[in-house]
Amino acid sequence: MALRTIRVQGDPVLEKICQPVKELTPRTKELIEDMLDTMYEANGVGLAAPQVGILKRIVVIDVGEGPVVMVNPVILETSGEQTGDEGCLSIPGKAGQVTRPNYVKVHAFDENMEEYEIEGTELMARAMCHEIDHLDGHLYVEKVEGQLHDVTYEEEE
């Protein structure tokens, strides 16, 4: 598979609303594999298709429990609240305090276009919200409470 270039803040593609995936083509499967490779190479916990320049509703996440592929994800339910540092591969070297739901339930399709629902708490809930925001042209910095701060490579999400 191939590594893709991660777009950084200021790139207009990050501000656009992504289109739903209508069918799973070989090209879309290749994109998903490339996104996973790119996320792991960058030591991230999540990556959305617009971060690699593709305006499709696809995200990949791995919070340490194995990869999760979400095609056309929709948040069904949220509850609770958590505030913590959040970073983004599209805003390297920075982080900021963001409040997100502590529980999230999402409806999505997997890499084979099989429908499923997934629940996440804590870091997984944060990652799901963060990545789905990308699909609607939003970056976490829009939600930061206070100022961004510098982070070392090991701390980045």
Task: List each language-model region with its residue ranges.
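Positively charged
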Residues: 1-157
